[in-house]
């Protein structure tokens, strides 16, 4: 596939991620990272510092005493939420933009990616390979970033793709995107990730989360974790519009994810509960995002 020139131009115009966000993702990719490393990055960014303190002191955390230091705040929020805050601050224009080409509203992409991130992290704990749950979380946050650009190129094609899928004339929404535009949101997403100089594990997740068997063998367990996390999020009611559940579940995930039916059910339940808590702590209520 070759990305059409107009989409390449749109990608080139995307603002770089903040240094804080890039450094946080790099640190989180190291399984031996410390709270101190995360706190040091947050402290170098006044806006991120303010948001981390706002979140940890929100009613959702229910702490009796106010937290006034970043190190203590990070020990409560955890690194995943800090990464989420950093991405939301520097790329909110992408994650909160209405995906009109997918017939979804403002904030739908962020909500879907957030629940995918939480579910992917939990699924990664059952991985048969050396899959870092923290990297799975970040991959989940970013897996559908390509839709922000693809949306404008789809036009009115979404309904045609849905109709074709219903009539079994196309295999899934990715194939429909390719037929309509000449590329798909996974390829566009990977191009955005390269534009942001993101590390290889995240490039693989973004490119192959709908085709995990095609991922590099080294990253395949990670990609399968996000693949399954994506489906959990869609089943949990946080899809991104017309394409929701119009993708194929690769049942080979069982070769990489050793999770029982009961454990999977618990992941789904726990992920949904954590999602609601994160939304409340970050935004006050889900409606405030919309």
Label every model-predicted segment:
Residues 1-247, 285-290:
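Conserved alpha-helical "signature site"
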Residues 1-6, 251-290:
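Terminal helices and disordered tails flanking the catalytic cores of nucleotide-processing hydrolases
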């Amino acid at each position: 596939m070759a990305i059409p020139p107009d989409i390449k131009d749109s990608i080139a115009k995307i603002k770089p991620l903040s240094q804080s966000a890039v450094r946080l993702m790099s640190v989180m990719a190291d399984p031996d990272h410390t709270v101190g490393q995360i706190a040091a990055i947050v402290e170098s960014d006044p806006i991120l510092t303010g948001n981390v303190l706002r979140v940890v002191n929100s009613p959702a955390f229910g702490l009796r005493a106010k937290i006034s230091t970043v190190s203590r705040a990070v020990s409560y929020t955890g690194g995943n939420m800090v990464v989420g805050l950093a991405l939301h601050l520097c790329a909110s224009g992408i994650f909160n933009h209405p995906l009109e080409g997918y017939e979804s509203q403002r904030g739908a992409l962020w909500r879907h990616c957030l629940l995918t991130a939480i579910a992917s992290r939990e699924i990664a704990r059952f991985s048969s390979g050396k899959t870092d749950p923290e990297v799975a979380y970040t991959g989940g946050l970013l897996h559908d970033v390509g839709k922000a650009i693809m949306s404008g190129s789809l036009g009115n094609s979404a309904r045609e793709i849905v109709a074709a899928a219903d009539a079994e004339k196309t295999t899934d929404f990715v194939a429909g995107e390719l037929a309509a535009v000449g590329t798909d949101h996974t390829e566009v997403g990977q191009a955005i990730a390269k534009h942001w100089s993101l590390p290889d594990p995240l490039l693989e997740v973004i490119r192959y989360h709908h085709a995990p068997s095609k991922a590099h063998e080294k990253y395949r367990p990670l990609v399968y974790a996000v693949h399954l996390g994506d489906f959990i999020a869609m089943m949990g009611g946080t899809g991104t519009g017309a394409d929701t559940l119009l993708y194929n579940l690769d049942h080979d995930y069982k070769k990489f994810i050793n999770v029982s039916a009961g454990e999977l059910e618990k992941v789904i339940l726990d992920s949904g509960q954590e999602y609601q808590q994160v939304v409340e702590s970050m935004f006050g209520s889900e409606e405030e995002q919309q």
